């Protein structure tokens, strides 16, 4: 995994981040009930594999994030497994893998939070979409 560098705080970074967080709180409040996330098309990635944090991913929102940044449409919702289901712990946004740090900084100030890029990911040979996200998949 590669992390973006930390930038010095620029004028307006805090205000910009606060505006994003204020909108994100609407999303956070909505998806405290993980059933609503499932109803809205989020799917649990690898639900049968024990994890520290479970990613409820939205392929539609991920694809949308390749061209626009919409705080109300996070690519993934992050949940902790609890005795009666899942407890919302955070939200995650995506950007194109080829974005520069300047482009990422336009989405959210790098002075306040880093972005990360997954590198050296092992994927199965063949049709990635069908292998990773088969039509009858319970996740992905």
Task: Give the predicted meaning of each segment.
Residues 1-140:
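Primary mode marks residue(s) on the alpha4-beta5-alpha5 output face of response regulator receiver
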């Amino acid at each position: 995994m590669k992390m973006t560098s930390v930038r010095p705080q620029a004028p307006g970074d805090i205000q910009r981040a606060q505006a994003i967080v204020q909108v994100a709180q609407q999303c956070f409040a909505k998806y405290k009930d993980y059933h609503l996330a499932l109803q809205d098309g989020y799917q649990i990635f690898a639900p049968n594999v024990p994890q520290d944090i479970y990613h409820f991913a939205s392929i539609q929102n991920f694809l949308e994030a390749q061209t626009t940044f919409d705080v109300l449409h996070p690519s993934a919702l992050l949940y902790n497994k609890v005795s009666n289901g899942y407890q919302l712990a955070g939200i995650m946004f995506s950007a194109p893998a080829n974005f520069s740090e300047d482009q990422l900084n336009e989405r959210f100030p790098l002075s306040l939070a880093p972005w990360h890029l997954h590198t050296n990911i092992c994927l199965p040979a063949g049709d990635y979409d069908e292998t990773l996200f088969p039509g009858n998949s319970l996740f992905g």
